[in-house]
Amino acid sequence: MDKYDVVKDLGAGNFGVARLLRHKDTKELVAMKYIERGRKIDENVAREIINHRSLKHPNIIRFKEVILTPTHLAIVMEYASGGELFDRICTAGRFSEAEARYFFQQLICGVDYCHSLQICHRDLKLENTLLDGSPAPLLKICDFGYSKSSILHSRPKSTVGTPAYIAPEVLSRREYDGKHADVWSCGVTLYVMLVGAYPFEDPNDPKNFRKTIQRIMAVQYKIPDYVHISQECKHLLSRIFVTNSAKRITLKEIKNHPWYLKNLPKELLESAQAAYYKRDTSFSLQSVEDIMKIVGEARNPAPSTSAVKSSGSGADEEEEEDVEAEVEEEEDDEDEYEKHVKEAQSCQESDKA
Protein backbone atom coordinates (compact mmCIF):
# COMPACT_ATOMS: atom_id res chain seq x y z
CA MET A 1 0.00 0.00 0.00
CA ASP A 2 3.02 2.27 0.40
CA LYS A 3 3.10 3.10 -3.32
CA TYR A 4 -0.50 4.38 -3.50
CA ASP A 5 -2.34 7.40 -2.12
CA VAL A 6 -6.10 7.16 -1.46
CA VAL A 7 -8.08 9.67 -3.54
CA LYS A 8 -11.70 8.79 -2.69
CA ASP A 9 -14.24 6.02 -2.14
CA LEU A 10 -15.88 4.60 -5.27
CA GLY A 11 -18.67 2.59 -3.65
CA ALA A 12 -19.42 -1.02 -2.80
CA GLY A 13 -20.06 -4.18 -4.82
CA ASN A 14 -20.73 -7.88 -4.26
CA PHE A 15 -17.55 -8.39 -2.33
CA GLY A 16 -16.90 -5.18 -0.44
CA VAL A 17 -15.59 -1.68 -0.95
CA ALA A 18 -13.83 -0.02 -3.87
CA ARG A 19 -11.54 2.99 -3.67
CA LEU A 20 -9.74 5.23 -6.12
CA LEU A 21 -5.99 5.48 -5.57
CA ARG A 22 -3.09 7.23 -7.28
CA HIS A 23 0.30 5.61 -7.81
CA LYS A 24 2.86 7.83 -6.08
CA ASP A 25 5.51 7.45 -8.79
CA THR A 26 3.57 7.14 -12.06
CA LYS A 27 0.54 9.20 -10.92
CA GLU A 28 -1.67 6.60 -12.59
CA LEU A 29 -5.19 6.31 -11.16
CA VAL A 30 -6.27 2.79 -10.23
CA ALA A 31 -9.30 1.20 -8.61
CA MET A 32 -8.70 -0.96 -5.55
CA LYS A 33 -11.23 -3.45 -4.23
CA TYR A 34 -11.02 -5.06 -0.81
CA ILE A 35 -12.00 -8.54 0.40
CA GLU A 36 -11.81 -9.24 4.11
CA ARG A 37 -9.09 -11.71 5.06
CA GLY A 38 -10.01 -15.11 6.43
CA ARG A 39 -12.98 -17.31 5.52
CA LYS A 40 -14.05 -15.16 2.55
CA ILE A 41 -10.81 -15.94 0.73
CA ASP A 42 -11.63 -19.33 -0.77
CA GLU A 43 -10.85 -21.24 -3.96
CA ASN A 44 -13.41 -19.14 -5.85
CA VAL A 45 -11.51 -15.95 -5.05
CA ALA A 46 -8.21 -17.47 -6.15
CA ARG A 47 -9.68 -18.85 -9.38
CA GLU A 48 -11.43 -15.63 -10.32
CA ILE A 49 -8.32 -13.52 -9.70
CA ILE A 50 -6.27 -15.82 -11.90
CA ASN A 51 -9.01 -15.74 -14.54
CA HIS A 52 -9.12 -11.95 -14.48
CA ARG A 53 -5.33 -11.78 -14.78
CA SER A 54 -5.56 -13.71 -18.05
CA LEU A 55 -8.12 -11.36 -19.63
CA LYS A 56 -6.59 -8.82 -21.98
CA HIS A 57 -9.32 -7.09 -23.98
CA PRO A 58 -10.25 -3.43 -24.58
CA ASN A 59 -13.78 -4.07 -23.26
CA ILE A 60 -12.66 -5.66 -19.99
CA ILE A 61 -11.24 -3.86 -16.96
CA ARG A 62 -7.54 -4.72 -16.75
CA PHE A 63 -6.21 -6.55 -13.70
CA LYS A 64 -2.97 -5.12 -12.30
CA GLU A 65 -1.98 -6.76 -9.01
CA VAL A 66 -3.07 -8.03 -5.61
CA ILE A 67 -1.80 -6.59 -2.34
CA LEU A 68 -2.12 -7.95 1.19
CA THR A 69 -3.09 -5.40 3.86
CA PRO A 70 -3.33 -6.13 7.61
CA THR A 71 -7.07 -6.85 7.31
CA HIS A 72 -7.90 -7.29 3.60
CA LEU A 73 -6.83 -8.69 0.27
CA ALA A 74 -6.73 -5.69 -2.09
CA ILE A 75 -7.21 -6.15 -5.83
CA VAL A 76 -5.75 -3.39 -7.99
CA MET A 77 -7.19 -2.82 -11.45
CA GLU A 78 -7.71 -0.30 -14.21
CA TYR A 79 -9.83 2.74 -13.32
CA ALA A 80 -12.71 3.66 -15.64
CA SER A 81 -13.36 7.37 -15.09
CA GLY A 82 -16.70 7.41 -16.93
CA GLY A 83 -18.51 5.54 -14.15
CA GLU A 84 -21.22 2.90 -14.49
CA LEU A 85 -23.35 2.47 -17.59
CA PHE A 86 -26.22 2.24 -15.09
CA ASP A 87 -25.69 5.87 -14.04
CA ARG A 88 -25.59 7.01 -17.66
CA ILE A 89 -28.99 5.44 -18.29
CA CYS A 90 -30.41 6.88 -15.07
CA THR A 91 -29.37 10.32 -16.30
CA ALA A 92 -30.65 9.83 -19.85
CA GLY A 93 -33.80 7.87 -18.99
CA ARG A 94 -33.16 5.59 -21.94
CA PHE A 95 -30.92 5.48 -25.00
CA SER A 96 -31.65 5.83 -28.68
CA GLU A 97 -31.47 2.58 -30.60
CA ALA A 98 -28.15 3.67 -32.13
CA GLU A 99 -26.57 4.44 -28.75
CA ALA A 100 -27.89 1.21 -27.21
CA ARG A 101 -26.43 -0.74 -30.14
CA TYR A 102 -23.05 1.01 -29.73
CA PHE A 103 -22.73 -0.20 -26.13
CA PHE A 104 -24.31 -3.60 -26.81
CA GLN A 105 -21.77 -4.30 -29.56
CA GLN A 106 -18.93 -3.68 -27.12
CA LEU A 107 -20.58 -5.75 -24.40
CA ILE A 108 -20.98 -8.71 -26.75
CA CYS A 109 -17.34 -8.45 -27.89
CA GLY A 110 -16.10 -8.48 -24.30
CA VAL A 111 -18.33 -11.37 -23.24
CA ASP A 112 -17.46 -13.36 -26.37
CA TYR A 113 -13.77 -12.96 -25.55
CA CYS A 114 -14.36 -14.26 -22.01
CA HIS A 115 -16.29 -17.24 -23.34
CA SER A 116 -13.50 -18.02 -25.82
CA LEU A 117 -11.30 -18.57 -22.75
CA GLN A 118 -14.06 -20.66 -21.09
CA ILE A 119 -14.73 -17.92 -18.54
CA CYS A 120 -18.35 -17.04 -17.77
CA HIS A 121 -19.16 -13.82 -15.96
CA ARG A 122 -22.50 -14.91 -14.41
CA ASP A 123 -23.25 -11.44 -13.07
CA LEU A 124 -23.59 -9.25 -16.15
CA LYS A 125 -25.63 -6.12 -15.50
CA LEU A 126 -25.43 -2.39 -16.03
CA GLU A 127 -23.75 -1.91 -12.66
CA ASN A 128 -20.94 -4.24 -13.76
CA THR A 129 -20.26 -2.36 -16.98
CA LEU A 130 -18.09 0.73 -16.68
CA LEU A 131 -17.13 3.44 -19.15
CA ASP A 132 -13.83 5.17 -19.78
CA GLY A 133 -13.68 8.95 -19.98
CA SER A 134 -13.49 9.35 -23.77
CA PRO A 135 -16.14 11.29 -25.77
CA ALA A 136 -17.23 8.03 -27.44
CA PRO A 137 -17.02 5.90 -24.28
CA LEU A 138 -15.35 2.53 -24.30
CA LEU A 139 -17.37 -0.02 -22.34
CA LYS A 140 -15.47 -2.06 -19.75
CA ILE A 141 -16.82 -5.22 -18.09
CA CYS A 142 -15.84 -5.57 -14.44
CA ASP A 143 -16.56 -7.61 -11.28
CA PHE A 144 -15.57 -11.17 -12.08
CA GLY A 145 -17.07 -12.71 -8.96
CA TYR A 146 -14.56 -12.03 -6.24
CA SER A 147 -16.87 -13.41 -3.54
CA LYS A 148 -18.29 -16.89 -3.00
CA SER A 149 -20.79 -17.88 -5.64
CA SER A 150 -24.26 -17.19 -4.30
CA ILE A 151 -27.14 -19.60 -4.86
CA LEU A 152 -28.06 -17.62 -7.95
CA HIS A 153 -24.57 -16.57 -9.06
CA SER A 154 -26.03 -13.10 -9.46
CA ARG A 155 -26.54 -10.58 -6.71
CA PRO A 156 -27.66 -7.11 -7.64
CA LYS A 157 -26.49 -4.28 -5.43
CA SER A 158 -28.89 -3.33 -2.66
CA THR A 159 -29.61 -0.06 -4.47
CA VAL A 160 -31.18 -2.07 -7.30
CA GLY A 161 -32.43 -5.08 -5.35
CA THR A 162 -33.96 -7.07 -8.21
CA PRO A 163 -33.36 -10.50 -9.75
CA ALA A 164 -34.17 -8.90 -13.10
CA TYR A 165 -31.03 -10.05 -14.97
CA ILE A 166 -31.21 -13.71 -13.99
CA ALA A 167 -31.96 -16.33 -16.65
CA PRO A 168 -34.78 -18.88 -16.13
CA GLU A 169 -32.38 -21.82 -15.93
CA VAL A 170 -30.48 -20.17 -13.06
CA LEU A 171 -33.71 -19.74 -11.10
CA SER A 172 -34.59 -23.40 -11.63
CA ARG A 173 -31.73 -24.44 -9.29
CA ARG A 174 -30.53 -27.03 -11.78
CA GLU A 175 -27.09 -27.08 -13.37
CA TYR A 176 -26.87 -24.64 -16.22
CA ASP A 177 -24.49 -23.40 -18.91
CA GLY A 178 -23.08 -20.08 -17.78
CA LYS A 179 -22.55 -18.99 -21.39
CA HIS A 180 -26.27 -19.23 -22.16
CA ALA A 181 -27.09 -17.37 -18.95
CA ASP A 182 -24.65 -14.59 -19.90
CA VAL A 183 -26.46 -14.17 -23.23
CA TRP A 184 -29.78 -13.72 -21.39
CA SER A 185 -28.22 -11.08 -19.13
CA CYS A 186 -26.86 -9.25 -22.18
CA GLY A 187 -30.42 -9.19 -23.51
CA VAL A 188 -31.72 -7.68 -20.28
CA THR A 189 -29.00 -5.04 -20.47
CA LEU A 190 -30.01 -4.20 -24.05
CA TYR A 191 -33.69 -3.95 -23.10
CA VAL A 192 -32.94 -1.62 -20.18
CA MET A 193 -30.84 0.62 -22.43
CA LEU A 194 -33.70 0.85 -24.94
CA VAL A 195 -36.64 1.13 -22.54
CA GLY A 196 -35.22 2.50 -19.31
CA ALA A 197 -36.92 -0.26 -17.27
CA TYR A 198 -36.39 -3.95 -16.53
CA PRO A 199 -38.15 -6.32 -18.96
CA PHE A 200 -39.68 -8.68 -16.41
CA GLU A 201 -40.62 -6.34 -13.58
CA ASP A 202 -44.21 -5.25 -13.13
CA PRO A 203 -43.92 -1.44 -13.43
CA ASN A 204 -46.74 -1.10 -10.90
CA ASP A 205 -45.12 -3.50 -8.44
CA PRO A 206 -41.35 -3.51 -9.15
CA LYS A 207 -40.27 -4.83 -5.74
CA ASN A 208 -42.47 -7.93 -5.98
CA PHE A 209 -39.74 -10.52 -6.52
CA ARG A 210 -42.26 -13.35 -6.80
CA LYS A 211 -43.99 -11.64 -9.70
CA THR A 212 -40.67 -10.81 -11.38
CA ILE A 213 -39.55 -14.43 -11.18
CA GLN A 214 -42.89 -15.66 -12.55
CA ARG A 215 -42.52 -13.28 -15.49
CA ILE A 216 -38.95 -14.41 -16.13
CA MET A 217 -40.00 -18.08 -16.18
CA ALA A 218 -42.89 -17.25 -18.53
CA VAL A 219 -40.75 -14.87 -20.63
CA GLN A 220 -43.45 -12.26 -20.15
CA TYR A 221 -42.24 -8.91 -21.45
CA LYS A 222 -43.25 -6.28 -23.97
CA ILE A 223 -41.89 -3.15 -25.61
CA PRO A 224 -43.92 -0.13 -24.43
CA ASP A 225 -45.82 1.79 -27.12
CA TYR A 226 -43.79 4.94 -26.46
CA VAL A 227 -40.53 3.14 -27.36
CA HIS A 228 -39.97 2.96 -31.10
CA ILE A 229 -37.39 0.38 -32.14
CA SER A 230 -36.79 -1.50 -35.37
CA GLN A 231 -38.21 -4.93 -36.17
CA GLU A 232 -34.64 -6.27 -36.37
CA CYS A 233 -34.02 -5.17 -32.78
CA LYS A 234 -37.28 -6.74 -31.61
CA HIS A 235 -36.32 -9.95 -33.40
CA LEU A 236 -32.94 -10.07 -31.66
CA LEU A 237 -34.57 -9.61 -28.25
CA SER A 238 -37.07 -12.37 -29.01
CA ARG A 239 -34.18 -14.72 -29.86
CA ILE A 240 -32.38 -13.88 -26.61
CA PHE A 241 -35.40 -14.16 -24.32
CA VAL A 242 -36.00 -17.89 -24.85
CA THR A 243 -36.70 -20.10 -21.81
CA ASN A 244 -34.98 -23.16 -23.28
CA SER A 245 -31.34 -22.11 -23.12
CA ALA A 246 -30.36 -24.67 -25.77
CA LYS A 247 -32.62 -22.85 -28.26
CA ARG A 248 -31.47 -19.37 -27.24
CA ILE A 249 -29.40 -17.41 -29.74
CA THR A 250 -25.64 -17.85 -29.26
CA LEU A 251 -23.00 -15.13 -29.17
CA LYS A 252 -21.76 -16.25 -32.57
CA GLU A 253 -25.26 -15.87 -33.99
CA ILE A 254 -25.67 -12.47 -32.32
CA LYS A 255 -22.44 -11.30 -33.96
CA ASN A 256 -23.92 -12.24 -37.34
CA HIS A 257 -27.34 -10.71 -36.68
CA PRO A 258 -28.23 -7.80 -39.03
CA TRP A 259 -29.10 -5.48 -36.13
CA TYR A 260 -25.78 -6.11 -34.41
CA LEU A 261 -23.77 -5.66 -37.60
CA LYS A 262 -25.26 -2.26 -38.43
CA ASN A 263 -22.67 0.52 -37.92
CA LEU A 264 -20.31 -1.93 -36.23
CA PRO A 265 -17.19 0.07 -35.22
CA LYS A 266 -14.15 -1.09 -37.16
CA GLU A 267 -12.21 -1.71 -33.94
CA LEU A 268 -14.76 -4.42 -33.07
CA LEU A 269 -14.19 -6.37 -36.28
CA GLU A 270 -12.48 -9.74 -35.82
CA SER A 271 -9.37 -8.54 -37.70
CA ALA A 272 -9.02 -5.47 -35.49
CA GLN A 273 -9.44 -7.58 -32.36
CA ALA A 274 -6.68 -9.93 -33.50
CA ALA A 275 -4.39 -6.97 -34.16
CA TYR A 276 -5.09 -5.63 -30.67
CA TYR A 277 -3.97 -8.87 -29.01
CA LYS A 278 -0.70 -8.80 -30.96
CA ARG A 279 -0.09 -5.12 -30.21
CA ASP A 280 -1.02 -5.16 -26.54
CA THR A 281 1.90 -6.68 -24.69
CA SER A 282 1.06 -5.20 -21.28
CA PHE A 283 0.20 -7.65 -18.54
CA SER A 284 0.29 -8.02 -14.80
CA LEU A 285 3.85 -8.11 -13.49
CA GLN A 286 2.74 -10.55 -10.81
CA SER A 287 3.17 -14.19 -11.70
CA VAL A 288 0.44 -16.72 -11.01
CA GLU A 289 2.71 -18.18 -8.31
CA ASP A 290 3.08 -14.79 -6.60
CA ILE A 291 -0.67 -14.21 -6.69
CA MET A 292 -1.44 -17.65 -5.27
CA LYS A 293 1.05 -17.08 -2.46
CA ILE A 294 -0.56 -13.74 -1.52
CA VAL A 295 -4.06 -15.23 -1.72
CA GLY A 296 -2.90 -18.13 0.45
CA GLU A 297 -1.64 -15.72 3.09
CA ALA A 298 -4.93 -13.81 2.91
CA ARG A 299 -6.75 -16.97 4.03
CA ASN A 300 -5.29 -16.36 7.47
CA PRO A 301 -7.61 -14.12 9.50
CA ALA A 302 -6.58 -10.54 10.13
CA PRO A 303 -4.07 -10.08 12.97
CA SER A 304 -5.24 -8.73 16.31
CA THR A 305 -5.73 -4.99 16.76
CA SER A 306 -2.37 -4.68 18.48
CA ALA A 307 -0.63 -6.35 15.55
CA VAL A 308 -2.30 -3.94 13.14
CA LYS A 309 -1.18 -0.97 15.19
CA SER A 310 2.40 -2.08 15.12
CA SER A 311 2.40 -2.55 11.36
CA GLY A 312 1.18 0.79 10.10
CA SER A 313 0.30 4.40 10.73
CA GLY A 314 -2.85 5.66 12.40
CA ALA A 315 -4.19 6.69 9.00
CA ASP A 316 -3.79 3.13 7.73
CA GLU A 317 -5.63 1.78 10.76
CA GLU A 318 -8.52 4.16 10.18
CA GLU A 319 -8.70 3.18 6.53
CA GLU A 320 -8.82 -0.53 7.31
CA GLU A 321 -11.55 0.01 9.94
CA ASP A 322 -13.63 2.03 7.46
CA VAL A 323 -13.34 -0.71 4.85
CA GLU A 324 -14.36 -3.39 7.36
CA ALA A 325 -17.43 -1.43 8.47
CA GLU A 326 -18.57 -0.86 4.88
CA VAL A 327 -18.06 -4.53 3.98
CA GLU A 328 -20.19 -5.66 6.94
CA GLU A 329 -22.98 -3.26 5.94
CA GLU A 330 -22.94 -4.59 2.37
CA GLU A 331 -23.06 -8.20 3.63
CA ASP A 332 -26.26 -7.46 5.53
CA ASP A 333 -27.85 -6.06 2.36
CA GLU A 334 -26.84 -9.16 0.36
CA ASP A 335 -28.20 -11.56 2.98
CA GLU A 336 -31.52 -9.69 2.91
CA TYR A 337 -31.60 -9.92 -0.89
CA GLU A 338 -30.87 -13.63 -0.93
CA LYS A 339 -33.60 -14.22 1.65
CA HIS A 340 -36.16 -12.49 -0.58
CA VAL A 341 -35.12 -14.49 -3.64
CA LYS A 342 -35.30 -17.78 -1.73
CA GLU A 343 -38.82 -16.83 -0.67
CA ALA A 344 -39.72 -16.07 -4.27
CA GLN A 345 -38.31 -19.41 -5.42
CA SER A 346 -40.32 -21.23 -2.75
CA CYS A 347 -43.43 -19.45 -3.97
CA GLN A 348 -42.63 -20.51 -7.51
CA GLU A 349 -42.26 -24.14 -6.44
CA SER A 350 -45.47 -24.06 -4.40
CA ASP A 351 -47.32 -22.65 -7.42
CA LYS A 352 -46.21 -25.72 -9.42
CA ALA A 353 -47.34 -28.13 -6.70
UniProtKB/Swiss-Prot annotation:
EC number: 2.7.11.1
Record's subcellular location: Nucleus
Gene Ontology biological-process entries: protein phosphorylation; response to osmotic stress; response to salt stress
Any Pfam family hit: Pkinase
Keywords assigned by UniProt, alphabetized: ATP-binding, Kinase, Nucleotide-binding, Nucleus, Serine/threonine-protein kinase, Transferase
EC main group: transferase
An example Gene Ontology CC term for this record: nucleus
Bias type Basic and acidic residues, positions: 337-353
SUPFAM superfamilies the UniProt entry points to: Protein kinase-like (PK-like)
GO molecular function: ATP binding; kinase activity; protein kinase activity; protein serine kinase activity; protein serine/threonine kinase activity
CDD domains, per database record: STKc_SnRK2
Record's note on what induces expression: By abscisic acid (ABA), salt, and osmotic stress.
Record-annotated Protein kinase domain positions: 4-260
Region span, Disordered: 299-353
Ranges annotated as biased composition (Acidic residues): 315-336
Composition bias type Polar residues, residue spans: 302-313
SMART domains attached to this UniProt entry: S_TKc
Sites where the protein binds ATP: L10, G11, A12, G13, N14, F15, G16, V17, A18, K33
Principal localisation: nucleus
The reaction(s) this protein catalyses: L-seryl-[protein] + ATP = O-phospho-L-seryl-[protein] + ADP + H(+); L-threonyl-[protein] + ATP = O-phospho-L-threonyl-[protein] + ADP + H(+)
PANTHER family referenced in this protein's UniProt entry, alphabetically: SERINE/THREONINE KINASE, SERINE_THREONINE-PROTEIN KINASE SRK2G
Protein name: Serine/threonine-protein kinase SRK2G
Organism: Arabidopsis thaliana (Mouse-ear cress)
